Regions:
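An N-terminal, well-structured beta->alpha segment
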Residues: 1-64
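Conserved beta-strand elements of the Class I
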Residues: 34-35, 90-92, 135
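Local beta-strand N-terminus motif with an aromatic residue
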Residues: 30-32, 88, 171
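A glycine/threonine-rich phosphate-anchoring loop and its flanking beta-alpha core
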Residues: 112-184, 190-193
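N-terminal small/polar loop signature for handling phosphorylated ligands or for N-terminal nucleophile
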Residues: 42-115
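Conserved active-site and cofactor/substrate-binding residues in soluble primary-metabolism enzymes
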Residues: 16, 20, 28, 45, ...
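Hydrophobic residues at beta-strand termini and immediately following loops
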Residues: 12-13, 64-67, 164, 176
Length: 197
């Protein structure tokens, strides 16, 4: 049986890697970032470390923070509408799996508007076009959402989660800078479970 391995375009690792966000944005001729980050990361200044790089390099952005620990259909819908109004042409996902998953869903729907309802992407998604380019900046270790082709969304109404698998949603750039890692208790529990199982 054949195995398929899919890799993102570029990954940067090490202290100071965050500075490469500006270089990559300029190299790709991106005009404005739609920054997806949860309220806690904004509150504790983690998001600002990324936006400081953008500010220093004169790069435009808009922040979207309607992201929950387990992103919902509503979070995605609001994000899609906000992205359309923003005039952005790429996404920067800052955080753990929740920010990454929200960004992937937004990016896929913007690029493939026929799948406006994220529930239609459950399972192996039948999209035709790559999502809006994503630069992923993980702040936790373990989810690997910055280099994988799936995302998980919560359907609050039906009290269930569903997985979308789509090779078109992988971030083009991953920035693994140890200075960005946070040690928040609510994500530490899941990391321990990864280690045990």
């Amino acid at each position: 049986m054949a195995n398929r391995i899919m890799l993102n375009e570029t990954s940067y690792h090490g202290a100071g890697a965050i500075e490469e966000i500006a270089n990559e944005a300029k190299a790709h001729d991106f005009k404005k970032a739609f920054v997806c980050s949860d309220p806690d990361l904004i509150k504790f200044g983690v998001t600002k470390k990324v936006t400081d790089v953008l500010d220093k390099n004169g790069l435009a952005y808009e922040i979207y923070s309607d992201i929950k620990a387990n992103p919902t259909i509503e979070n995605v819908q609001h994000g899609v509408e906000a992205f359309k109004k923003s005039g952005a042409d790429y996404l920067i996902a800052i955080g753990g799996g929740s920010s990454m998953d929200t960004s992937k869903a937004i990016g896929i729907i913007i690029a493939n508007p026929e799948f406006e309802d994220v529930r239609s992407l459950e399972g192996v998604a039948p999209t035709k076009k790559p999502c809006v380019p994503i630069i992923a900046v993980p702040t936790t270790a373990g989810t690997a959402a910055e280099v994988t082709i799936n995302y998980v969304i919560t359907d609050v109404e039906r009290k269930r989660k569903f997985v979308c698998v789509d090779p078109h949603d992988m971030p083009i750039i991953a920035i693994a800078d140890p200075d960005r890692k946070s040690t928040r208790l609510n994500s530490s529990h899941s990391k321990i479970s990864y280690a045990v199982f």
